[in-house]
């Protein structure tokens, strides 16, 4: 068991679990209540934010139709849990494709709590000027791109109230996620909730940067776009896993176990 795993599971009261426990409301509440302390402990030792990957999929693993039209998967009950996670996260991150398709606000609405800082992964700074997340009150929207600070698009976004984070490109020309997380750490962000879409979720898992997973499974078949792309040759396993029945949905909580 490596240091990274020890750090994430410290105080959780369990080692690797062969099975998955069913949890009641009390255990779920403790998980959310302990998130800020867990994130602060992780941040102090790693100097980067704790990353919680959270998304909803159908029983057949779809997150959208094949023509990329969003479909409502989460019930109201599981959406409340999603908003609880937003409320205990310092920031919430999505990719530019999700923003263009959904134009979300990324705020906390179904529970009491503070809104997380919105972060958009947008290598080429394609975010539309009319995006709601740029115009909402509160935190400035952070846009992570690979375009240099002298580009005219940077000035346009900053004039709209956004903050452009200049990141190194990875080998594919996209935002280097490790570099981004360390830049967020320097800004004092201790936890980041990654909500999508599938390409972004896959990138965090491929890079072994997902520290916790919260997966909502809806009792539907869609036959659409898969939630995940190719991850690695070895299957990904988890520790400290438990699930909670939330209305018609099942919400799965776990810590990825990265094999050396």
Listing of model-derived features with the role each one plays in the protein:
Residues 2-260:
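Enzymes that bind and transform nitrogen-containing heteroaromatic metabolites
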